[in-house]
Amino acid sequence: KRKASSAGGARQQVVRLQNALIHIMQDADKLHYEGRYKYLKPIVDKVFDFPFISRVVMGPDWPKLDTEQRKQLQKALAKLSVSSFAKEFDSYSGQKFVYDSTRSMGRGKLVRYVFHSGNDRIHFDYQMHKAADGQWKIANVIVDGVSDLALKSGQYRSLYAKKGYSGLIAWIKKQIEAKAKASV
């Protein structure tokens, strides 16, 4: 019984995100980018583990950041994630997420869904783990075999090495602004 509720908690977080994504797609014309962003922000903040994600993407450079820089990076990554969802999930024509499976993965879970959009099938694998608050949270999203965390890790570490912390944050902010402008 405990195992089922454990897997259910992990899956429930994914369902919470997906329900929000379907909602913003269905109401995309009414919400526009800003409305989609505002609707998603509290949900994304609740279901993703941005403290963990920040540590992973910074890797060996994480200890070099002070507490304020860490918090700022976590907030920037959260805003970037929300802006990406708000930009990409901007119209609805019957798309749906279909549950595939949940399996144990080390101390975490891998929750798989298939996104049906017309004839396209896109696999979303959500790597879940227990966050510091004891809740299941999304640590990584793998879309058709491509890990978002791996992509960001390489990109952000390279930016940090070349431009320093302020350059990295400035770049993330520019990405957020670009997504907002592209959605107008």
Question: Where are the regions that the model predicts?
Answer:
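Short, low-structural-confidence N-terminal segments
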Residues: 1-6, 184
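Early exported N-terminus immediately downstream of N-terminal targeting peptides
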Residues: 7-85
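Soluble periplasmic/extracytoplasmic beta-strand elements of cell-envelope proteins
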Residues: 15, 20-24, 98, 112-114, ...
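Intrinsically disordered, low-complexity linear regions
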Residues: 39-42, 49, 53, 104, ...
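A mature extracytoplasmic/lumenal domain signature
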Residues: 77, 101-103, 114-117, 128-130, ...
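Surface-exposed, charged secondary-structure patches
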Residues: 83-125, 172-184
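Short beta-strand edge/turn micro-motifs at domain boundaries
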Residues: 121-151
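Low-complexity, intrinsically disordered terminal/linker segments enriched in charged
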Residues: 143-184
